[in-house]
């Protein structure tokens, strides 16, 4: 049996191991297409700001082809370094594209104000054609609709500080698009707006240079469909991270945005490790989890072997990303999601609509957290030097905290949320109608009187005796009440206290002419 277990461990390890690179075969190269990337041909700030202005207009032109759009974006992304050409040549290793660099200098004879650097050859017409200045219609389209503030006619500046602020503002909006351009483009607008507000408050960007939604949609779609552009962006991030010492301000901002980009598309794998394994609940000892635990161990080893590109495997369309999906460990993933929902409020909005989602193990994770509340790990306590008396104190405090949390969370759930307007009185609110409405009013009144006379324990019995027979029971609440009557009783007592307080406040406020009405609709708009 020991030999079988060793063979099984070796089999699992080799099964998930990536292919070993061999020198016997040649490198496979695809059919390349050429991408022209304009870069500044001198160190003048005027040249760089004018080039940035023309490239932003070019991207806003709806008639621009895909490769030309990619070249313009690469040119903007590399403008913050001293030598953009050297940077592009150093980090670019793409089997699908061939990058051609074109140096751009100032020119007074071209409509765009720029020309391609050449030895004695007049390239003004070619530069105007590239920057779409040969067609007045396309020029008008690119002239308007790129910045939200229509009063900004151009972004040409003379001083380096102003140029860095404008360039940093534009780059921040482009880099933020990479976070969800591949994984969740439909829901990306909200998160992108939150990042923009954050950097505006930190004075890293200038609010006046917020780009229009159409311009951002064009860039997001291009990032999603062009793997070569994403490869360049990931290579640029890794190159910035390897740079020792102090980095430029724009480079530090890119590293900050990288915290939202890294591990995109790997939420199932990361959250399973966080909530399923790191919490170290005893449920991990179940036989059902044995095989999936070994699978996760192999995947963690594979993740480390992939090196610095592992967090970007989904963005880079690495085929090995399928091994890390939750379908490879469905039971452990379902259990981890149950643990996460109980521990963190942010997990409540996660989408669990997967075909391999197992509700039984999801419930197992929830119950594991609830019943383990207040318990102190003996191993961790010994490592931290926590005495037995301190452990008992911590358990007691944690139990009271958990009980308060459960009493606030458990209770009847609203089937529909209605908003109260200032022009609505209490008599105009929607009613149940008929006999059922009178029964509910009677039960509430008797419950308040019972609470005042006999206290919370007998009031809860009166509440239970007068529940409407036609009221549907919530399945989750009914299950939890049957499993833990104490929690159900505590929840009912809490509700009766609230109803009694509401009754007292109504009696106190009956003498006033105008009731106080709170309208929360504006908070949700």
Curated annotation (Swiss-Prot):
The keyword RNA-binding applies. Keywords: Capsid protein, Helical capsid protein, Host cytoplasm, Host nucleus, Host-virus interaction, Phosphoprotein, Ribonucleoprotein, RNA-binding, Viral nucleoprotein, Virion. GO terms for molecular function: molecular adaptor activity; RNA binding; structural molecule activity. Changing residue 351 to A: Slower nucleocapsid assembly. Changing residue 202 to A: Poor and slower nucleocapsid assembly. Residues 1-403 are annotated as: Ncore. Phosphorylation at Thr-279 is required for the formation of the nucleocapsid. Residues 433-452 have a biased composition (Basic and acidic residues). Homomultimer; forms the nucleocapsid. Binds to viral genomic RNA. N0 interacts (via Ncore) with the phosphoprotein (via N-terminus); this interaction allows P to chaperon N0 to avoid N polymerization and non-specific RNA binding before encapsidation. Interacts (via the Ntail) as N-RNA template with the phosphoprotein (via C-terminus XD); this interaction maintains the P/L complex anchored to the nucleocapsid template during the sequential transcription. This is Nucleoprotein. It comes from Measles virus (strain Edmonston-Moraten vaccine). The gene is N.
């Amino acid at each position: 049996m020991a030999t079988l277990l060793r063979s099984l461990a070796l089999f699992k390890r080799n099964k998930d191991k990536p292919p070993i690179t061999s020198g016997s075969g040649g490198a496979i190269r695809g059919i390349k297409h050429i991408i022209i990337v304009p870069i500044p041909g001198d160190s003048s700030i005027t040249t760089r700001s004018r080039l940035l202005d023309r490239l932003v207009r070019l991207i806003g032109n709806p008639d621009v082809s895909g490769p030309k759009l990619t070249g313009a974006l690469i040119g903007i992304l590399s403008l913050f370094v001293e030598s953009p050409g050297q940077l592009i040549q150093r980090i670019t290793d793409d089997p699908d594209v061939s990058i051609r660099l074109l140096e751009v200098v100032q020119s007074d004879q071209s409509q765009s104000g720029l020309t391609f650097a050449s030895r004695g050859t007049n390239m003004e017409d070619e530069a105007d054609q590239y920057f779409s200045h040969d067609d007045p219609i396309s020029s008008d389209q690119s002239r308007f609709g790129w910045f939200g503030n229509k009063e900004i006619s151009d972004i040409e500046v003379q001083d380096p500080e102003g140029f860095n602020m404008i360039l940093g503002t534009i780059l921040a909006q482009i880099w933020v698009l990479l976070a969800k351009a591949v994984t969740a483009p439909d829901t990306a607008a909200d998160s992108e707006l939150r990042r923009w507000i954050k950097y505006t408050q930190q004075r890293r960007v200038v609010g006046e240079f917020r780009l229009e939604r159409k311009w951002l949609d064009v860039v997001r779609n291009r990032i999603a469909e062009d793997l070569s552009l994403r490869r360049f962006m990931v290579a640029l991030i890794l190159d910035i991270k390897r740079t020792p010492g102090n980095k430029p301000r724009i480079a530090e901002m890119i590293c900050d945005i990288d915290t939202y980009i890294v591990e995109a598309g790997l939420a199932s794998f990361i959250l399973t490790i966080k909530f399923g394994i790191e919490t170290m609940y005893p449920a991990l000892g179940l036989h059902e989890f044995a095989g999936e635990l070994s699978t996760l161990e192999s995947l963690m080893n594979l993740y480390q072997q992939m090196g610095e590109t592992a967090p970007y495997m989904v963005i880079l369309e690495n085929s090995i990303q399928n091994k890390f999906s939750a379908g490879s460990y469905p039971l452990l993933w379902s259990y981890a999601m149950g643990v996460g929902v109980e521990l963190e409020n942010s997990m409540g909005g996660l989408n669990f609509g997967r075909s391999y989602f197992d509700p039984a193990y999801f419930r197992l994770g929830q119950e594991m957290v609830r019943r383990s509340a207040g318990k102190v790990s003996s191993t961790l306590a010994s490592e931290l030097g926590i005495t037995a008396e301190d452990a008992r104190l911590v358990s007691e405090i944690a139990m009271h905290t958990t009980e308060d949390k459960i009493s606030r969370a458990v209770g009847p759930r609203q089937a529909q949320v209605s908003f109260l307007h200032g022009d609505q009185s209490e008599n105009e609110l929607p009613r149940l109608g008929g006999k059922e409405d009178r029964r509910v009013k009677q039960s509430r009144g008797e419950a308040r009187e019972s609470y005042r006379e006999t206290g919370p324990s007998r009031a809860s019995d009166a509440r239970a005796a007068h529940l409407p027979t036609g009221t549907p029971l919530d399945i989750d609440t009914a299950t939890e009440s049957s499993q833990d009557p104490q929690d159900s009783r505590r929840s009912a007592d809490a509700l009766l206290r609230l109803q009694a307080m509401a009754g007292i406040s109504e009696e106190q406020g009956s003498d006033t002419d105008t009731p106080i009405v709170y309208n929360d609709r504006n908070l949700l708009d």
